[in-house]
Each structure stands twice: as structure tokens, then as C-alpha cells.
Design a protein with these regions (language model features):
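Generic hydrophobic, amphipathic alpha-helix propensity
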Residues: 1-5, 22, 47-55, 119
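Amphipathic alpha-helical interface segments
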Residues: 4, 8, 79, 140-147, ...
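Amphipathic alpha-helical segments used for helix-helix packing
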Residues: 72-75, 83-106, 120, 135-138, ...
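Hydrophobic alpha-helical connector segments
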Residues: 46, 57-86
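Helix-turn-helix
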Residues: 4, 8-42, 46
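C-terminal peripheral helix-coil segments that are non-catalytic and often amphipathic
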Residues: 116-128, 146-190
Length: 190
């Protein structure tokens, strides 16, 4: 059901997708959807949470790591870009739906804010700087959503490396520090 909803929301749009269409695409009865989800909003919320929870869990674990902050930040960015590029449907485009601004998606926004805060903490620690670059870092990470939309055959591994390196450049790391961050094994790398 979630796969069918994701495909329809990302291609047809949220408003234009009915629970009947989701049920048909999933090969289930419409009543089955309502047995598990209160409606379309609940389906969309679950899809949105699935794009942010794994990254936040990793970010929380990395926050307490002993590896250099640049290595932990590089690892988080690399994993987050991989998550946003995973699967047959570009779920990141759901972030851009106007409906997502609604109050019913407050849990998603709260988790995304926590992720942005973790990015800020790691970015500040990696640079020993005082300014908050979390929003810029998250913006660079989430830029893969548009790249994936425009380039369906994206070389994900190359993009993961490029974005992770780019984030470290953004926070002021030198080429030597970036090379070290790439080389340091991080215990929670995914």
C-alpha cells in the first residue's frame, strides 16, 4: 500500500490521488487501507517519516561518536544522500508538496528540525566555528532530490561522495581534512 501510495503521490500528486486509486494500484480493497491508515494524510505522513527517521537515528548515534566530527558528518551526509536516492520512487519530492505544510505533518517537521539541528552540531564541531550552517548543509544534502528527478540514472555512489565532500568544504574543511574524514572508519557507517 505504501509503495502504491508513494508512486501515485510522486507522479499524479497528492490531491489527485484517491484512496481508491491507491487500493487498485496495491491490489487491495479500499477498506483494507482504512484498516491500517486513517486516510491519505496518514499514508503521506508515514512515507515522509520513512525518509527522515533513519537519518535522524544515525545522526543521534553519530552525535556521541568519538571519531573526528568531520568524519561523522561525512558519514551522515553519505548515508542520508543514499537514503534519498534509494528505492524506485523519489520520495524526497514529497517534501515539496504544498500539502506537507499542514499541521497534520507536524511530526515530520519536528523530526526534520531535529535532523537539521544534528547537522548544525556536527558542522560546527567539524569546523570549530560558531555559525549555524545546518540549514545550508541539509539543503545541499536534499539537493539530490532535484538531481534525482532530473537525472533518473544518477550514479548514486558518486553523488554520495561528491555531496559529502561538498558539505565538508562548505563547513570549511581543508582538502587534507576531507581526505582524512573519508578514510576514518566510523563505527556506525551504513
Amino acid at each position: 500500500v505504501l509503495d502504491a501510495a508513494a508512486a501515485l503521490f510522486c507522479t499524479v500528486g497528492f490531491t489527485s490521488t484517491s484512496t481508491r486509486a491507491i487500493a487498485d494500484a496495491a491490489g487491495v480493497r479500499q477498506a483494507s487501507i482504512y484498516h491500517h491508515f486513517a486516510g491519505k494524510d496518514a499514508l503521506l505522513l508515514e512515507l515522509l517519516l520513512g525518509t527522515v527517521r533513519p537519518s535522524l537515528e544515525l545522526a543521534d548515534a553519530l552525535a556521541t561518536g568519538t571519531e573526528p566530527a568531520a568524519a561523522r558528518l561525512w558519514t551522515l551526509v553519505h548515508a542520508d544522500v543514499g537514503l534519498l536516492c534509494a528505492g524506485p520512487v523519489n520520495l524526497g519530492v514529497l517534501y515539496m508538496l504544498p500539502e506537507v505544510a499542514g499541521e497534520q505533518f507536524a511530526e515530520f517537521h519536528a523530526l526534520r528540525s531535529r535532523l537539521r539541528a544534528r547537522y548544525s552540531e556536527l558542522a560546527t564541531a567539524a569546523d570549530d566555528g560558531a555559525d549555524d550552517r545546518g540549514a545550508l548543509v541539509l539543503g545541499l544534502v536534499e539537493s539530490v532530490i532535484v538531481r534525482r528527478r532530473d537525472t533518473p540514472d544518477l550514479d548514486v555512489a558518486a553523488v554520495q561522495d561528491a555531496v559529502a565532500d561538498g558539505v565538508l568544504r562548505l563547513v570549511g574543511c581543508t582538502p587534507a581534512e576531507i581526505a582524512l574524514a573519508r578514510a576514518v572508519p566510523v563505527a556506525l557507517a551504513v
